[in-house]
Regions:
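A short, Lys/Arg-rich alpha-helix, primarily the initiator
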Residues: 1-12
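Short alpha-helical DNA-recognition segment
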Residues: 15-30
């Protein structure tokens, strides 16, 4: 399932996939795969993404 919440939060912060990837130390392809729903990130990666985007795990990764 696509992670549109993560993409929306990234765009709202005016960050490209590459910029977010550089901030958290992963490849742009990893960010793309997470947003497309092709990759299930580790909890540590989820936390790093949340910190950079100013969101909680619930806001970005939990469905509800």
């Amino acid at each position: 399932m696509k992670n549109l919440k993560m993409k929306s939060a990234r765009v709202a912060k005016d960050l490209s996939q590459q910029q977010l990837a550089d901030l958290i130390g992963v490849s742009r392809q990893t960010i793309s795969a997470i947003e497309k729903g092709d990759y299930n990130p580790t909890i540590n990666l989820c936390i790093a993404i949340c910190r950079e985007l100013g969101k909680t795990l619930d806001e970005l990764f939990w469905e509800g």
